C-alpha cells in the first residue's frame, strides 16, 4: 500500500526555491495545489510539480519548523535519481540562488564561478566602493 511521505528540508523562502526548481527545468504547476498518490489519493501542497517519469512532488509550508517540506508518494517515485539526491540538488541550487540574491542586494558582482568535480560551486565576488 502506498502513502504520502513528508521529508523535512531547510528551505525557508519561496523565491529561491522556485528559482532553484526552474533552474533544473522542473515545471511548477501554479494551478494545482495538490499532489496525487496511490489510487487517486490527493494531499494539499503549496507548490506542486511533475517530474519526468510521471512523478508528482510538492512542497508544503510547515509552520512548526518554519520551512518547506517535500511531499510525494515514494512508492510512485519513478524519477531517474533517488529522492535524497533530488533534495540535495534542489537544496544546493536554493543556497546558490539565495547567495546570489543577497550579494547582489549588497552590491556585489560575480567575478568568477567554478563548478567543481565534487559537485560544489565556487564563487568569487567583488564589490566596488565609490
Language model region names:
Residues 1-130:
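Interaction-mediating elements
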